């Protein structure tokens, strides 16, 4: 009788294992992070295969099908997200706009991180007057009204794509310089850097093979957190007509273009606006999650 009772009590125990594993999984990977990763992967897939996924060329016009509403608003599957006043397919333009905006944001963020990290490491290595100059440049950059300067530069020199990417790359480099300088100074005071230096290793090897790999996780987290800001900056400048110029297209370009048809054809700017919001939100969620897991200063 005792064995029967013991067996009855012990029967539910196997169910606790899978439930606890699921709880641990969602604790390590929250649903919001999984959704953010899924959206980012979808955007990267679209950017890589926009030529294959787009049913039309983003410059193809059809004046007989101008301002066609999307499927949910009385349109047909010929234009899933509708068309603009020149008959261009909004869905096709959206796919190529995602590619363009992500490329600009990626190279702009990478350029800013490269400039800032290089200056930060130089300040940490040479110290003294070099550090003073770098800190002065950091304060100067942080105090500049970047948007006004960007408007002036693009209006004066024209809106070439290369100049636009370089200009975005010079935005926000000071945050990487501060991080790289502080972490490099801390790393130089630790035993492994001093030991390599005493063995006669050159400075480029010390920083390239020992210091930089140890501070890379924090820099990557900072890049992830800055990426949404770069997307919004590109979208804002393109919205004002100073970013990506026709016939090229970007998310901000589409929003600025659809502004003129907000009353008659709101779908022109609705789709790129939703993509901008969801993309920046997803990358921000992923960046916060990476910061909690990778940033050693939070442990």
Give the residues covered by each predicted segment.
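Hydrophobic alpha-helical transmembrane segments of polytopic
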Residues: 35-43, 164
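A general boundary/transition motif marking the beginning of the first structured unit of a protein
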Residues: 1, 10-14, 33, 55, ...
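Intrinsically disordered, low-complexity segments enriched in proline/serine/threonine
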Residues: 14-16, 20, 57, 71-72, ...
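Transmembrane alpha-helical segments of polytopic membrane transport and secretion proteins
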Residues: 1-38, 285-299
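Alpha-helical transmembrane segments of integral membrane proteins
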Residues: 31, 86-299
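Hydrophobic alpha-helical transmembrane segments of membrane transport/permease proteins
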Residues: 38, 46-83, 242-248
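Generic N-terminal simple sequence motifs
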Residues: 8-10, 14, 51, 65-66, ...
